[in-house]
Regions:
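Dinucleotide-binding Rossmann-like beta1-alpha1 core, especially the glycine-rich loop
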Residues: 44-123
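Glycine-rich FAD pyrophosphate-binding loop
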Residues: 6, 20-41
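Beta1/beta-strand and adjacent pyrophosphate-binding region of the FAD-binding site
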Residues: 1-11
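Conserved flavin/dinucleotide-binding core of flavoenzymes
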Residues: 290-405
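Conserved Rossmann-like nucleotide-cofactor binding loop
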Residues: 11, 33, 235
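Feature captures the FAD/FMN-dependent oxidoreductase FAD-binding
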Residues: 62-75, 79-90, 138-144, 201-207, ...
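Mid-domain catalytic core of redox enzymes
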Residues: 213-316, 321-330, 334, 359-362
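Active-site/ligand-binding neighborhood in enzyme catalytic cores
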Residues: 87, 103, 110-211, 224
Length: 405
C-alpha cells in the first residue's frame, strides 16, 4: 500500500511516523520541513516564529520523550508585560498587577475572577458568541478598550469583531499557568529543529509542489497512491476544496521579524505592545541563555491577512516600519546588528463565531484525509500540541479504514 502525505509540518511528520510500519509512505513538502516550526540557521538554530510549550501539552511532551529529547527539555518562569504610553509594565506577579496604574482595583479583581473561571468553562458553549460583545457585557467599555482591544487588534486586526469568545477563553486558560514569580513555559534547549530532524529521520521526503487528482485512483504529481493525507491550509487544495464542499475558512498571515540587538530591551520575555506595526516583543534571550547564541535575539510579532498590506509589502519596507516602532523602546538603528523578516501566508485560521461547525473531519472521501489547523485538536486555538494530536488521530482513522488494526 502507498500513502502520500502532503506537508512536512508537525501533523504530517507525526502521521508519517505512525503509518510507516504499515505502508510505503512518501511525504511531499514544497518548503522547508517543519512548516511553521522550521528554523533559521546562523551558527545556531532558532525558530523563524517564536515557540514555547506548556505543562499541559501532553502530546508534545510524549513526542519529545519518544524521540529521545527529554534531556533537552527545560522549564523556566518568565516575565510578561504590557507597553503603553511609552512605558513598559511587568504584569508577571500579583504585586505587579496591583501596581499597574492603567486599571482600577475593581478592574483587576474582575480580571482575576475571569481568569480563574475561564479554566473551568467548556469553550464549545461559547463558540457562537462574539468576543467583543462578551467582554463588554462582563467588563464594560473601560477594561475592554484599555486591556483587551489592543491585544485583539494586534492578533486579528480588522477581523477582531468577528472572533469567537471561545478562542479568548482557551487563550486565557492556557496562559494562566502562573506561579507567584511569573508564567512557566518550556523549550527544547538549542531549538525545536532537533525534534523536526528526529521525526524526519527514515522518512522519504520529496521537496516539490503537489497536484492532487482523483481519476479512479488518487494521484500526486502523476503517481498513484492508495490514500492521501493533506495537512496544509484548505485554500491550497484548489478545486478539490470545492469538489468536496469544504468549509470556507478565513486565515490570518504571520509577519514576524527576528532581530539581533546590541542590548536587551528589558528583562521581560513577552511584552504586548499597543499602536505599533508589531503587536508583541518576544525577547528570546530573556528565556534561553544568551550564551547559546552569543547575541540578544528578539522577535517582533505581527499578524495580517493573505490580502493585507503588511503581508504583501516588501520585506525591506516591513523592516523599516518595525525598526521605526522599536525606537520607542530606546532601540536605535545602530543598535540592530541584523533583522530578518519571515512570512507565513496561512499561519492560522481566524476563529470566527461558528467556527466549530467548520472543523474538518479526518475522512473527507474514500482514501482522502485532511488533518492540521482545521482539525478538532486545534480548536479553539492552534498549537504544536494540537497539530501532533491531529497527526496521530488521522493516522488512526486511516489505519481503521484500511484494516491495519
Amino acid at each position: 500500500m502507498k500513502i502520500a502525505i502532503i506537508g512536512a509540518g508537525l501533523t504530517g511528520l507525526r502521521a508519517a511516523n505512525e503509518l510507516k510500519e504499515y505502508a510505503k509512505v512518501r511525504v511531499f513538502e514544497k518548503n522547508e520541513i517543519g512548516g511553521l516550526l522550521s528554523s533559521f540557521c546562523n551558527g545556531y538554530y532558532i525558530e523563524k516564529y517564536y515557540h514555547h510549550l506548556f505543562r499541559k501539552d501532553s502530546e508534545l511532551l510524549e513526542t519529545i520523550k519518544r524521540f529521545g529529547l527529554n534531556s533537552k527539555l527545560v522549564w523556566k518562569t518568565v516575565k510578561v508585560g504590557f507597553a503603553i504610553n511609552g512605558s513598559i509594565y511587568s504584569l508577571s506577579t500579583p504585586i505587579d498587577i496591583l501596581r499597574y496604574p492603567h486599571m482600577s482595583f475593581r478592574d483587576k479583581l474582575d480580571l482575576a475572577i475571569f481568569t480563574i473561571r475561564s479554566r473551568k468553562l467548556e469553550y464549545e458553549n461559547f463558540d457562537d458568541i462574539p468576543v467583543i460583545s462578551a467582554l463588554k457585557d462582563r467588563f464594560g467599555d473601560r477594561l475592554l478598550e484599555k486591556f483587551f482591544m489592543p491585544m485583539l487588534k494586534a492578533k486579528f486586526g480588522e477581523n477582531a469583531d468577528k472572533v469567537s469568545f471561545a478562542w479568548l477563553l482557551a487563550r486565557v486558560a492556557i496562559r494562566s499557568n502562573r506561579r507567584l514569580r511569573g508564567e512557566e513555559i518550556g523549550y527544547l534547549r538549542h531549538g525545536f529543529h532537533q525534534l523536526i530532524e528526529k521525526m524526519a529521520e527514515n522518512l522519504e521526503i520529496v521537496h516539490a509542489n503537489c497536484e492532487i487528482k482523483l481519476e479512479g485512483k488518487w494521484s500526486v504529481n502523476g503517481e498513484d497512491f492508495d490514500a492521501v493525507i493533506f495537512t496544509g491550509p484548505i485554500p491550497e487544495l484548489g478545486e478539490l476544496a470545492f469538489k468536496f464542499r469544504l468549509p470556507r475558512i478565513k486565515y490570518q498571515s504571520s509577519v514576524c521579524a527576528l532581530a539581533s540587538l546590541k542590548n536587551s530591551i528589558s528583562d521581560i520575555y513577552w511584552i504586548n505592545v499597543e499602536k505599533a506595526t508589531f503587536g508583541a516583543i518576544i525577547e528570546h534571550t530573556n528565556f534561553m541563555p544568551f550564551e547559546d547564541y552569543g547575541e540578544n535575539l528578539v522577535y517582533l510579532a505581527s499578524y495580517s491577512t493573505p490580502e493585507g498590506w503588511l503581508f504583501n509589502q516588501a520585506d525591506s519596507e516591513t523592516a523599516k516600519l518595525f525598526l521605526r516602532d522599536l525606537k520607542r523602546f530606546n532601540v536605535r538603528e545602530g543598535d540592530v546588528r541584523w533583522i530578518r523578516i519571515f512570512k507565513a501566508k496561512y499561519s492560522s485560521p481566524i476563529y470566527e463565531t461558528g467556527f466549530l461547525k467548520k472543523i474538518t473531519p479526518y475522512r473527507i472521501h474514500d482514501g482522502f484525509y485532511i488533518a492540521g489547523m482545521t482539525s478538532k485538536p486545534n480548536y479553539p486555538e492552534r498549537s504544536m500540541n494540537g497539530s501532533l494530536k491531529a497527526g496521530r488521530e488521522v493516522a488512526e482513522c486511516l489505519k481503521k479504514d484500511f484494516g491495519f488494526e
